[in-house]
Amino acid sequence: MLMSRALCRSWLPQVARRCHANVNVPILRINSGHPAARSCRQIHSNRKQSSNLKPTTGEPAAAEQNTPVPVNNVIKAVAFTGAFTVGCFAGATILEYENTRSLILEKARQARFGWWQSRSLADRDYWTQIKQDIRRHWDSLTPGDKMFAPILLCNLVAFAMWRVPALKSTMITYFTSNPAAKVVCWPMFLSTFSHYSAMHLFANMYVMHSFANAAAVSLGKEQFLAVYLSAGVFSSLMSVLYKAATSQAGMSLGASGAIMTLLAYVCTQYPDTQLSILFLPALTFSAGAGIKVLMGIDFAGVVMGWKFFDHAAHLGGAMFGIFWATYGAQIWAKRIGLLNYYHDLRRTKQK
């Protein structure tokens, strides 16, 4: 097998086991020096919920057979995905407008008060210098790093929350996606920032950082954010639909569905980019071939019912990335109508 799981959206045992990503990680690296890897999301079986998660021996837990998923939950999941996706892209459009407006106003202010900006640092107070240093450091980051940093922070906060015993029940309810649970919608989103194992978190963030800059440069920060967040929920929906179809309800968590979207988007946009496996630099292959192999593995996992990873979520994320690489430019161009409407609305309120 060309590559195995480093990025995993795996299936966790809901009661008897802890989320544990104890897997070997053959990681890919883009020849330009940026690392790439495989994604994983973890899954739990749908046993009676308990806030006491016992240590695992490292063996994956199989989802229980013949556990029905309520039809109402599936309908809610589909409706939430549609509404969330529309909201993300509408919000990204408004954010783009506000960022552009702020940039224009800032340039105008600098042109008018350039003498103030030209003062030496010695004439400024200590805190102003600190803020200026932080701003300069932030401005020196690549577009990908600027998108990666806040997403990493959110994942680290969620990871720390798993370590607080008093929050364990809340984390299970809202930060794991389970189609048979009472709360279905928001966990589809929050679970994409949730990792229980340090290895799981490291593998996913490592891969995301590898592809973030290529995606951010191609998409722009607002579109990148909308695609990433929407892809996370869409991959959760694919997991929900698969579990409903196979009557294998269980909890899932991990960022790999959204990351697979970035990976598939970049590999589709730049299919001739050469990838190599970390520690095996002599073995190279094209990005186009790599994504086909990864999707083939996930397709086999879905068809054969493999339980260690959430293959449906992986496959859904990859499909979203390929779709956006193919049709995203045309869809994103349609935001102009909303931009004009928001501009007129904002101007009306200012009168």
UniProtKB/Swiss-Prot annotation:
Mitochondrial intermembrane membrane side: 95-146, 204-223, 269-276, 333-351
Membrane topology: Multi-pass membrane protein
TM regions (residue ranges): 74-94, 147-167, 183-203, 224-244, 248-268, 277-297, 312-332
GO molecular function, one term: endopeptidase activity
A Gene Ontology cellular-component term: mitochondrion
Catalytic machinery residues: S256 (nucleophile), H314
Name of protein: Presenilins-associated rhomboid-like protein, mitochondrial
One record GO biological process: mitochondrial fusion
Subcellular location: Mitochondrion inner membrane
Broad EC category: hydrolase
Enzyme Commission designation: 3.4.21.105
Purpose of the protein: Mitochondrial intramembrane protease which plays a critical role in the regulation of mitochondrial function. Essential for mitochondrial development and fusion during spermatogenesis and the development of neurons and muscles. Essential for proteolytic processing of Pink1 and HtrA2 into their mature forms. May also be involved, but not required, for the proteolytic processing of Opa1.
InterPro entries (alphabetical): Peptidase_S54_rhomboid_dom (IPR022764), Rhomboid-like_sf (IPR035952), Rhomboid_protease_S54 (IPR050925)
